[in-house]
C-alpha cells in the first residue's frame, strides 16, 4: 500500500425505536482511498464497539489535509502489530513533513524491520511532538542539534578542459 491519505470517518448504529439517536463514532484512518478507509473503519468498529456494517451506517467521510505541509515536524506514533510470535505494542518517533508521510514511513519501516504487513498493523495514535525536549528516540534526536551539517566526503571538481590526457582524480 502506498500514497496514503488521511480520512475522518464518522458512523453510528442504525436508529431503532429504543435508541432513535445512536452514539456517533469518529475515527481518523490512513488509507489509499475512501473504499479502504470505510472498510478499515468497520473493521475497527466491530472490534471496539461491536457494530457491524449491516447494523450501522456511515454519516460522513472527509479527507483531512495537512495544515503546514512544508514544515518539518516530529511525530510520535503508537502502533499495535501482529507478528509471527504474537501481538506487540510499540511507540515510534518519525521526523517528516506531514502525518500521512510519517505513517507511510512507519509502514515501510515496519515492513523492513519486522516483516509486518499493512493488514497486521493497527495505528492507535499519531501525535505531533511540539517540544524538542520531549523527543525520546536517539534516531530522531540526532537531527535536532543546532547548526547541523552534513559532510560531503567525495566531491568532484568540474573539469575545465573538454579533452584531457589523463583520467581526473576525484580524491582530494
UniProtKB/Swiss-Prot annotation:
Entry protein name: Large ribosomal subunit protein eL20A
One Gene Ontology term of the molecular function aspect: structural constituent of ribosome
Organism name: Saccharomyces cerevisiae (strain ATCC 204508 / S288c)
Keywords noted in UniProt: Cytoplasm, Isopeptide bond, Phosphoprotein, Ribonucleoprotein, Ribosomal protein, Ubl conjugation
Assembly and oligomerization: Component of the large ribosomal subunit (LSU). Mature yeast ribosomes consist of a small (40S) and a large (60S) subunit. The 40S small subunit contains 1 molecule of ribosomal RNA (18S rRNA) and 33 different proteins (encoded by 57 genes). The large 60S subunit contains 3 rRNA molecules (25S, 5.8S and 5S rRNA) and 46 different proteins (encoded by 81 genes). eL20 forms multiple interactions with RNA and proteins in the central protuberance, connecting components of core functional centers that are located far apart.
Compartments in which it is found: Cytoplasm
Organism superkingdom: Eukaryota
Principal subcellular localization: cytoplasm
Gene: RPL20A
Lipid metabolism keyword on record: no
Cross-link (Glycyl lysine isopeptide (Lys-Gly) (interchain with G-Cter in ubiquitin)): 125, 131, 149
GO cellular component terms listed in the entry, alphabetical order: cytosol; cytosolic large ribosomal subunit
UniProt key word Cytoplasm: yes
Amino acid at each position: 500500500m502506498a500514497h496514503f491519505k488521511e480520512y475522518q470517518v464518522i458512523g453510528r448504529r442504525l436508529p431503532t425505536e429504543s435508541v432513535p439517536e445512536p452514539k456517533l463514532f469518529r475515527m481518523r484512518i490512513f488509507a489509499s482511498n475512501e473504499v479502504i478507509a470505510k472498510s478499515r473503519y468497520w473493521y475497527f468498529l466491530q472490534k471496539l464497539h461491536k457494530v457491524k456494517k449491516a447494523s450501522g451506517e456511515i454519516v460522513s467521510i472527509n479527507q483531512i489535509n495537512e495544515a503546514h505541509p512544508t514544515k518539518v515536524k516530529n511525530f510520535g506514533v503508537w502502533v499495535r502489530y501482529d507478528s509471527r510470535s504474537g501481538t506487540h505494542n510499540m511507540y515510534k518517533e518519525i521526523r517528516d513533513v506531514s502525518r500521512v508521510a510519517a505513517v507511510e514511513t512507519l509502514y515501510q519501516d515496519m515492513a523492513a524491520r519486522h516483516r509486518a504487513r499493512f493488514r497486521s498493523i493497527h495505528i492507535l495514535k499519531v501525535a505531533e511532538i511540539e517540544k524538542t525536549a520531549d523527543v525520546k528516540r536517539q534516531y530522531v534526536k540526532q537531527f535536532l542539534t543546532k547548526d547541523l551539517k552534513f559532510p560531503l566526503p567525495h566531491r568532484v571538481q568540474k573539469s575545465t578542459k573538454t579533452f584531457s590526457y589523463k583520467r581526473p582524480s576525484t580524491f582530494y
